[in-house]
Every structure is written in C-alpha cells, then in structure tokens.
C-alpha cells in the first residue's frame, strides 16, 4: 500500500511502534498508547451536563511506571514529519516531560529540552533512542546522581485490588518532591487546589521515601482530628495493613510510643496544653527524618505559631508544606519558610482538566446586606440591652449584631431553592460565621423543613467542633447514606475533608470562599453548585 494512503493508525502499527520496540522499549512496562490524561472539562447548559474532549497523547514512554520520559505524536504521511510538534510540546509541558517525538512514517522529529544545542533534530527510525539513553539524559538534566537514583526511581505504591492510579498532576508533584529530597533539598512547598488529592499525593511521596529507606521515621501534621483520622483510614491504611506489624500510629492523650515509623498528630496533640510538658519534646530533635505539614497555611507560618515551633525543634528533618493557598501577609509567609512552591496545580486547572466540576454562583441579595442596617435610637435587643447606635453591615452580622430574621430568611431562601429544583435530598453545607451562627442556622432550617425533620431528625445537623453532629461526618461523606442532608458548620469543614457527596454549598460568611468552593468541586456529582 502506498504510504500516502495509510491511516494514522497504519503508520503507527507499521512504522512507529516497531521503531520504538527495536530501540529496546518494553511494550508492557514502558509503552502506553492513546493515553488520556485529563477527563475533559465539564460544561453545564441549563440542566444538560457534558464533558469536553480529553487531552490524549498517542504514546507516552516511561522509564518506570509513573516516571514518564517522552511523548510521541503520530500523523499520517500526508503531514510533514514535524507536524503535531506544537501540540506535543504543550502536552509535554503539562506532563513535565522533557523529550518529544513526532512522526509521519518517514522518520522522527526529536525535540530535546535537555540539549544545549540542536534542540530539535530529525532521526531515522533506527536512530530512536533507547530507554537507557533517555534516562541518562534525564538524570543529567535533573542533576540526579548515581547515589540518588535509587530514591528517584523507587516504585510508587500499587495495590492490584485498587483501581486508583495517580493523576498526571499528582505524578508531577510526587516526582518533583522525591527528586528534590533526593538532591538534598530540606524545605519544600507543594500548592494544590483543594479537592485535587493532596493527601493521596502526600502518601505516595511518603511511601517512596520510606520504601527506599531514605526517610525512616515520618510525622504527618494537621490541625484537626478529621484531617488525621480520615487519611489513616483511607490513603495511608497500607502502613497498618499487617495487624501483626503495624507501622503507623496517632499521637494522642500525650502518649508517646517510639516503636512506630509513621506518626500522625494534630498540632494541639504534640504541643501540649497549659500545665503539661510539650509532648513533641518527648522525641529527640533528630527522631523524625521527614515531616509533612498538611494545610500548612492554617497553622500559620508566624515565628510563634504551633507548627513553626515543632518544625524548628525538628529542624534537621526534611519538611514539606502542603496547601491550596499559600499564606502571604505582612507577618506570615509560607514561602519565606518553605521556599517557592516546587509544583502548583490550581483550581482553574482542575476545572479545565475536568477533575473538578465548575460551579454556578447563585447570589441572593438581602436588603440589610446590600443597604446596611442602623437601629432606631434607643432600640433594645430581646434581652433588653440597648443596641449601639451606628451603621452595621455584613461584616457585623452574626458577630457584633445578630439579626434573627436575616438567619430565618437565609434558611427560607435556600430551602425554597432546593424545593424548586427537586433537590431536597441533595447534600448541602452551610458555612456560617461561628458556632453560634451555625446553631441558629440549624434551628432555622429545621423550622423551614419540618416535614422532613419529623421523618428523620438527622435531616439537619449542626457539625461544629465539640458538637454531637461531628459523629455524623462519615455518614455525610458517604454517598450511600441519605442522612444528614443539610449541615451547618463554621470552620470544621472549611478545608481538607473529603466530602465529594456535596451538591450545594451556601456561604453565609465572608471567609475563604474559593477554598470552600474548591473543596466541594470534586466531579462525582452534578456540577451545579
């Protein structure tokens, strides 16, 4: 058959794949064809939900699974040999891959990001580089020594009974972190949008460094019990899979057992309370080799912050901060402590790739929010206390001034919205100013939805620190559990909780809107938020 009459698939089968195999690439372990690495952006038109086209590479060549080296873009013979190079370079930039090949069946155009001269050249089919050749170039480009190669090439954790695989951006973050640690870098910052799998990324980093014995004792720090308990049950369960040889523990009740290898703790659990010795000082300063600080913006990077004291005590350990939003203020800086992020994956990227769902904003204007409120002179509250005569606005509500009618109106507006859209059993979070506001909102919602509350009182639950409702968090996060449905909270669920069951979020507070929206944008459910 005339080559000009061949399809792209024919060119791949007859010319490109044989050339790659002849160069020594393993078909089963090192070559993947037609690799879709995004899910396709979700678009919503009224009630019709569609996914856009996925980004797909014709070939990706790997040194080892999840350590990609090259992209190969194929065209039929009616194209020039270098056609498709721009698209392939774009994909390579996204995937953090240094080598790009294009072919129309006449040979290869080879782009080498690591080359000092002749960045793009043409190769005959029998000149296609071997895996060892590209790996050697990769190592030189990245500064990977023979000594650090063992760490960099350490396998990812893989469970044949679990179909979960790291997404491309997680691989980028994991590989960059492992390479940085292998090269001797001791302070790292990873910035990944909420909902994109920071905890799973942290697990793979920890696993590879632990498995290579580069880091033998590891501390995972968070600021809330749920951000410790949930990962221990899910992403990190491997470390306690053998009940006779548990490698992971949680520091609690000031109890310290130094027989484990992976430790989880909340800041309050290791810094102690008033009247108690600082628990973390029960460990020697050199005890931990690696410390991960989850949601590191929350603990603050101030010199006197809780986690800062811990990190300075264990200053010889490699320390990795993970956050969706690095904290940069006059007095506080994550970047000053950890350095510039070694990898960033934003909310916008997550939505464009289809890993996060877009959100629709429904703004409800309440007159007191838009116009402000000023009490009449001498007006008293329900307790008989005179209200200060001044202008109040949305920043005052539910903190300096409680307008009960406003809370009732918010509950009614949202309840009416859910009824109108046949979504009364769509799991919904109400973010409130504080615990008292969350309690008032829960009461107002119960009154607005009395018919369903009578059927099951867990239809509305207040989920704030210290409340009974916190016990329902697991049920709220489980798709098969119908209750609770409407949850009010203040700070407890603002970050890190894996609640991809949520369909609606209500922001009746002015803090961290993008973070909270991002957290609920995991694309399990309809993207109508």
Which positions does each model-derived feature cover?
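Conserved two-lobed SF2 helicase motor
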Residues: 259-273, 480-495
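Conserved helicase ATPase core of P-loop NTP-dependent helicases/translocases
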Residues: 461-489
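Interdomain helical connector at the RecA1-RecA2 junction of SF1/SF2 helicase-like NTPases
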Residues: 332-426
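SF2 helicase catalytic motif II
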Residues: 281-320
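ATP-dependent helicase/translocase motor core
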Residues: 1-217, 222, 226-242, 258-262, ...
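A short beta-strand element within the Helicase C-terminal
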Residues: 487-488, 493-510, 516
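Conserved small/polar residues in nucleotide/adenosyl-binding loops
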Residues: 515-521
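Conserved helicase motor "Helicase C" RecA-like lobe of SF1/SF2 P-loop NTPases
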Residues: 434-461
């Amino acid at each position: 058959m005339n080559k000009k009459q061949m399809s792209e698939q024919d060119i791949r089968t007859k010319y490109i794949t044989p050339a790659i195999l002849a160069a020594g690439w393993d078909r089963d372990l090192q070559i993947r064809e037609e690799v879709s690495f995004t899910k396709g952006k979700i678009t919503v038109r009224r009630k019709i939900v569609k996914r856009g086209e996925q980004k797909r590479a014709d070939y990706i060549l790997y040194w080892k699974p999840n350590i990609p080296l090259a992209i190969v873009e194929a065209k039929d013979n009616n194209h020039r040999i270098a056609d498709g190079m721009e698209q392939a370079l774009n994909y390579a930039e996204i995937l953090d891959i240094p080598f790009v090949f294009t072919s129309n069946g006449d040979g290869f155009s080879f782009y080498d990001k690591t080359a000092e001269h002749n960045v793009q050249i043409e190769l005959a089919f029998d000149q296609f580089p071997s895996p060892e050749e590209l790996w050697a170039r990769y190592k030189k480009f990245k500064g990977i020594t023979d000594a650090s190669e063992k760490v960099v090439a350490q396998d990812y954790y893989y469970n044949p009974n679990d179909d979960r695989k790291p997404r491309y951006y997680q691989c980028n973050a994991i590989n960059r972190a492992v390479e940085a640690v292998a090269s001797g870098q001791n302070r790292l910052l990873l910035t990944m949008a909420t909902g994109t799998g920071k905890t799973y990324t942290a697990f793979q980093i920890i696993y590879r460094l632990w498995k290579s014995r580069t880091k033998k004792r590891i501390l995972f720090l968070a600021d809330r019990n749920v951000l410790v308990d949930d990962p221990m049950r899910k992403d990190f369960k491997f470390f306690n899979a053998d009940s006779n040889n548990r490698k992971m523990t949680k520091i609690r009740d000031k109890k310290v057992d130094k027989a484990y290898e992976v430790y989880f703790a909340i800041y309050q659990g290791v810094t102690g309370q008033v009247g108690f010795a600082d628990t973390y000082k029960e460990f020697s300063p050199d005890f931990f080799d690696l410390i991960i600080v989850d949601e590191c913006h929350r603990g603050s990077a101030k010199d006197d912050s809780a986690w800062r004291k811990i990190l300075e005590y264990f200053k010889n350990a490699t320390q990795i901060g993970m956050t969706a939003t690095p904290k940069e203020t006059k007095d506080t800086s994550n970047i000053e402590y950890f350095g510039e992020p070694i990898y960033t994956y934003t909310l916008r990227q997550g939505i464009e790739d289809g890993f996060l769902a877009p959100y629709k904003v429904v703004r409800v204007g309440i007159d007191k929010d838009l116009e402000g409120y000023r009490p009449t002179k001498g007006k008293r509250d329900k307790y008989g206390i005179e209200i200060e005569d001044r202008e109040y606005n949305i920043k005052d509500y539910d903190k300096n001034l409680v307008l009960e009618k406003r809370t009732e109106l918010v509950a009614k507006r949202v309840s009416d919205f859910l009824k109108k859209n046949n979504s009364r059993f769509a799991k919904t979070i109400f973010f409130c100013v504080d615990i008292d506001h969350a309690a008032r909102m829960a009461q107002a919602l119960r009154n607005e939805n009395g018919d369903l509350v009578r059927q099951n009182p867990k239809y509305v639950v207040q989920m704030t620190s210290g409340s009974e409702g916190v016990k329902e968090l697991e049920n709220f996060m489980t798709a098969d559990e119908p209750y609770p449905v409407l949850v009010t909270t203040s700070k407890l669920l603002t970050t890190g909780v894996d609640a991809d069951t949520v369909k609606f979020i209500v922001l009746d507070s002015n803090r961290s809107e993008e973070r909270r929206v991002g957290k609920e944008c995991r694309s399990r459910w309809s993207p109508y938020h």
